[in-house]
Amino acid sequence: MKRNNNLIIPLLKIKKLLKRKGCKRIQNSALVFFSKVLQYLIEELLEISMNVSILNKTKKYRIKPKDISWSIQSDPEFNLLFRNIIIPSSGRISNKLNRIIQRSFKFKSFKFDDYEKSDYSSKTF
């Protein structure tokens, strides 16, 4: 496998995890693509979480589990992706705080039940 300096997540670790889950043969290009997608998702989540932590009254540059949970719940795409995930020591998000976060990021409120009932593929969030 070639060494790629732009990747944060090691390719061999991804390959071992996928093999443990049942993938017998994996192309190296698929591993690089998978690593890039994971890296992009992590960067986006950390960026939104940092903005949420700055928006709080403390205005500190430390991301807490609660900030990650708030950013997941305020973003419709992350909310859909992580709908069954529980983040330890993140607490519950209040509706008032959720509205403040959504207004500051200009997100549209989103419910997964609405997504199942109709086709949102042509609409933007």
From Swiss-Prot:
One of its GO terms (biological process) is heterochromatin formation. It is found in: Nucleus; Chromosome. Keywords: Chromosome, DNA-binding, Nucleosome core, Nucleus. InterPro entries: Histone-fold, Histone_H2A, Histone_H2A/H2B/H3. GO terms for molecular function: DNA binding; protein heterodimerization activity; structural constituent of chromatin. Gene3D superfamilies: Histone, subunit A. Transmembrane segments: none annotated. It comes from the Eukaryota. GO terms for cellular component: nucleosome; nucleus. Belongs to the histone H2A family. The nucleosome is a histone octamer containing two molecules each of H2A, H2B, H3 and H4 assembled in one H3-H4 heterotetramer and two H2A-H2B heterodimers. The octamer wraps approximately 147 bp of DNA. Core component of nucleosome which plays a central role in DNA double strand break (DSB) repair. Nucleosomes wrap and compact DNA into chromatin, limiting DNA accessibility to the cellular machineries which require DNA as a template. Histones thereby play a central role in transcription regulation, DNA repair, DNA replication and chromosomal stability. DNA accessibility is regulated via a complex set of post-translational modifications of histones, also called histone code, and nucleosome remodeling. This is Histone H2A.v3. It comes from Dictyostelium discoideum.
